[in-house]
Structure formats: structure tokens, C-alpha cells
A protein has these predicted regions:
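Conserved non-catalytic scaffold segment of RNase H-like nuclease domains
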Residues: 1-97
Length: 100
């Protein structure tokens, strides 16, 4: 079974926060998805911005998660998904429910 590796950056650590960046790479380190994401509801995230450096200006023209949802599903379908900080990151990715 192929393995992909996933990491996110978010607007914060609460359940109502959103992704601002998603990276999925393969075993060779090749990026399969590497994109900024424009949040639907959050317009600023100063605390998280201090951690990851991604500002609202950086994501103003980025796709929303809804727009890349099918791409995420295609990349993870049938693959083992290794997630950095899985308990946290997976709550931002309902697309993973269909992965196996």
C-alpha cells in the first residue's frame, strides 16, 4: 500500500478554526498537494500567524477547502495516510473519512 504524508497549518487550535495550508507528499518527498487555503469564516489569526507566518493577505487568492476537496480525496484514496499531529490535523479534513 502506498503511503502519503500530510501536514496542515491552521487559523488556530480550536475546533472552529480552519486550514490555511495543506501539504501532502509521497514517499519520495514529491508534493502531491501543496497549497495555501482561503478560510471561509476566519479573517484574521494573529496568534497562529506568529507561529506559521501565513497571513490573511497570503491566502486572499487561494482556493477554499471546498474547491480542493475532490483533489484531496483523489490523492489519499486507497493510500495509508500518515499525519503529523494526527489527532489535531485530521479534524480539519473530513475528506480523509473516504481514504481507505
Amino acid at each position: 500500500m502506498e503511503t502519503v504524508y500530510l501536514d496542515t497549518e491552521t487559523t488556530g487550535v480550536s475546533d472552529d478554526d480552519e486550514m490555511v495550508e495543506l501539504t501532502i507528499i509521497d514517499d519520495d518527498g514529491k508534493p502531491l498537494i501543496n497549497t495555501l487555503i482561503k478560510p471561509k469564516y476566519h479573517t484574521s489569526w494573529p496568534g497562529a500567524q506568529r507561529v506559521h507566518g501565513i497571513s490573511p493577505i497570503d491566502v486572499r487568492h487561494a482556493p477554499t477547502q471546498d474547491r480542493i476537496s475532490n483533489d484531496i480525496r483523489k490523492v489519499v484514496k486507497g493510500k495509508r495516510v500518515v499525519i503529523y499531529n494526527a489527532p489535531f490535523d485530521s479534524k480539519f479534513l473530513p475528506e480523509l473519512e473516504d481514504a481507505a
